[in-house]
Amino acid sequence: MATAQLQRTPMSALVFPNKISTEHQSLVLVKRLLAVSVSCITYLRGIFPECAYGTRYLDDLCVKILREDKNCPGSTQLVKWMLGCYDALQKKYLRMVVLAVYTNPEDPQTISECYQFKFKYTNNGPLMDFISKNQSNESSMSSTDTKKASILLIRKIYILMQNLGPLPNDVCLTMKLFYYDEVTPPDYQPPGFKDGDCEGVIFEGEPMYLNVGEVSTPFHIFKVKVTTERERMENIDSTILSPKQIKTPFQKILRDKDVEDEQEHYTSDDLDMETKMEEQEKNPASSELGEPSLVCEEDEIMRSKESPDLSISHSQVEQLVNKTSELDMSESKTRSGKVFQNKMANGNQPVKSSKENRKRSQHESGRRVLHHFDSSSQESVPKRRKFSEPKEHI
């Protein structure tokens, strides 16, 4: 039994490099971060069935990793897309991956939710500016700091995906790849992709923009952003967002300090995991988060071997993640276990579905937000930049 356990653990472990001193080690980390992020998002948003995922361990965290499955053509297709991303990433062409969710199979340009993964390649070696905007000091990025940031980013994604309102039952996926045009050959296309013909998208409803987090290595910067409908944020635990950002109106737009040269704008609702932990240390009973479905029983064994390099302690994780066994299972819920109460109108009549409300509000106000991922406000006519889209949608 002990031998079997020792043999199983290395096979199922998803290990981030303990030392990042070469560009190859950094590339391995960024690829794995992208894989874990996409897998976490698609799993907790219920896009693919359970059979499309395998179990892996990320230090003390049990995660589900997307895999090819003959019974799930969609997951197989997404894995192929990811391989195309890896090709562009390895060549240092890839600037941004946009994974978008849409509801009308005939209209993939009108999306309901999207996830942006941005990549930067640095030439400064191990010296880079990773301090806040108010502190311009440069400091060496240690492997320990990178690993902590990686674990923290994955945990932030978990928390957000658990608390967002559910997606419609039937959704489709598409992916757009954007490049650094100055170094990317005009005729380059990753495996499984073709030249895109529609750079912008139309967002259903009122979009909310969230900066989830980033990870820096001596050679790469990896950043994750999420755009979702405002109504999916209505039931989110407000303590997840930093107090400073909560006070800011939803309509207030702030410039993303890391991409000012691209003139991209995001609202100020950044996830603040550190603030959430501090509040729960003072008042542990205030947490209302459910336990991720990604955490299986074997994870309790892994927790006893927790690495000292983790960005948050075991006790903080326990305060952050609560059991969901006592929740009312008759209510609607997401795969993560988060329960959403059905709103009632006129005392006992359920309100119309969110999709019906969305269509009605769009008809009344004409609000369908056109979003260009790569346009500059300084240009009267936005410059068309090279991008790719899949040969086949999911």
UniProtKB/Swiss-Prot annotation:
Listed GO CC annotations: chromosome; nucleus; synaptonemal complex
Localization terms from the record: Nucleus; Chromosome
Motif Nuclear localization signal extends across 383-386
Basic and acidic residues bias (residue ranges): 253-282, 362-374
Iron among keywords? no
Report domain HORMA positions. Answer: 24-226
Q: Where on the tree of life does the source sit, at the highest rank?
A: Eukaryota
Pfam families, sorted: HORMA
| Comp. bias (Polar residues) | 310-324, 343-352
Keyword annotations: Chromosome, Differentiation, Meiosis, Nucleus, Oogenesis, Phosphoprotein, Spermatogenesis
User: Where are the Phosphoserine modifications?
Assistant: S376
What are the recorded Gene Ontology BP terms? blastocyst development; meiotic cell cycle; meiotic DNA double-strand break formation; meiotic recombination checkpoint signaling; meiotic sister chromatid cohesion; oogenesis; regulation of homologous chromosome segregation; spermatogenesis
Q: What is its main location?
A: nucleus
Description of post-translational modifications: Phosphorylated at Ser-377 in a SPO11-dependent manner.
Q: Which cysteines are joined by disulfide bonds?
A: none
Outline what the protein does.
Answer: Plays a key role in meiotic progression. Regulates 3 different functions during meiosis: ensures that sufficient numbers of processed DNA double-strand breaks (DSBs) are available for successful homology search by increasing the steady-state numbers of single-stranded DSB ends. Promotes synaptonemal-complex formation independently of its role in homology search.
Quote the subunit structure annotation.
Interacts with HORMAD2. Interacts with IHO1.
Could you identify this protein by its name?
A: HORMA domain-containing protein 1
Gene source species: Macaca fascicularis (Crab-eating macaque)
Q: Which gene encodes it?
A: HORMAD1
